[in-house]
């Protein structure tokens, strides 16, 4: 178990270091390039772990910018409008994504809210934000920082891979 957790943590570190080093996604026989837009660079990195270079991946919040204080712009709504899948954490972390989806005229089924996609069947137990020791009390209820736990990050990677494979079965062989 420890070895597996270390491996996942190492993969996350490598993906963060390699951000931007991959090649562009290519169109496939059954459709154009699949565009995945993540709310943060962290979730974009997890998406790269999940799907490699099979899809085009970008993030809304630039690296180094705090998701808690980020203010989306009209250009972000335009980026959402052209995305096939929007990957967010949910659980109140990137609460602005709902308004951005509406502004872009995007349906809710284009959103994969990772934290809300996990449940007991995944072996995940949510921590109360107060019990977790989350600094500042910025979140009500559940602690949304699931990806900080290697098991949580691995579950996020699995959820992203499963969703892209379901959306585009032609890409599943490349994932």
Role assignments for model-derived ranges:
Residues 2-10, 17-174:
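Extracytoplasmic metal-acquisition and chelation regions
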